[in-house]
Amino acid sequence: MQLGAQRRMIVHAPWGVLIASLAVSLIGLYNLMSAARSMWTSQAIYLGVGIAVLVAVTLVDLRFIQSAAVPIYLLNIGLLLLLKLVGTRAKGAESWLVLGPFRVQPAEFMKIGMVLMMAKYFHDDDRPAAPSYGFLRLLPPLVLAIVPTLIVLVQPDLGTALMMTFTALTLIAFARVKWTVVVAAGVVGLLGAGVIWNDFARPVPEGEKRVTLIRHHMKKHQEGRITGWLEPESDLKGTNYHSMQSKIAVGSGGFAGKGWKEGTQTALRYLPEQHTDFIFSVWAEEHGFLSCLLLLLLYGVILVGSLGVAYQSRDRFGAFVAVGIAAMIFWQVFENIGMVTGLLPVTGITLPLMSYGGSSMVSVMLGLGLLANISMRRHLF
């Protein structure tokens, strides 16, 4: 590649997204020194590996990545199935593969594989004469999303399965669906809300047994998370303990926070999973409302910048990949912050680039590398 082309590629990199992502990652490292200092070194290594992966992905021709979407998807499906044979159980789920000194969570990389596979389908199925998708044309991408989502769901990892579902639905919506599909989706959503209301919130006369549709099929901890969300003041020493301690931490931070390492909920270890699921609560308690706004602003830059990459992409595959990566990050941030503030049920979803975890860090950096690749090469198409 000529020097001029290389310079143009560097100029076209999504620097706003990359700088904001690095800033969030460094904030996460700083925050982790208070939440769990012993894990700081490992997370710094994960960040270094993630940056190396990001750079490596930008060097690969996007057309090669597109052609490799099918084997990448199938490889990730195979790794998910392998968990049933040699997976390690933690927190009630068979979600980790142990590779020597490392533990890998295949579901994190499956999200990337699903995005690539669905993007390839929508690219290959481009029909200018019939741009809108009806029920039949949506069956293949739905199957591509449902298969890995169900495998993750039976681990069981409900949180990741939900994130995959919302990411897939975002890609389908971006593909332009017919109004009949929108109406059908609305009806399904209303029916789902009705089922939840019937199973968890409908008043039942004394002495009458509640007839449920899905609740009796749920695991005890899953049922408890929904009942705890709907009844936040109940069972504060059991089901709602996590949520209560998190809300105390977030609320007690006030406008400017208590100061680094001065958070009582954090220092006294009242806050559960403070290095992973509830890392935002640590940040809110110690640094306050203003710093939380700064963090949300950085995530906003990542989201808007990612959508900008999709908008400017001259390649349909690249546009769908960019939207998929943006959706993957957005829904995870949305659910995690909603969870720690009590607005959404606790699902065990980590905060991208902030929470401790190698698989999460590297997979998000891989997604950001794809974004950079799409943005840098858009002038070549």
Residue ranges of model-derived segments:
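Short, charged, intrinsically disordered terminal tails
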Residues: 1-6, 10, 207-217, 377-381
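N-terminal membrane topogenic signal
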Residues: 4-21, 65
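Transmembrane helix boundary and interhelical junction motifs in multipass membrane proteins
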Residues: 157-162, 259-263, 274-276, 347, ...
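Long extracytoplasmic/lumenal interhelical loops at the membrane interface
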Residues: 244-290, 317
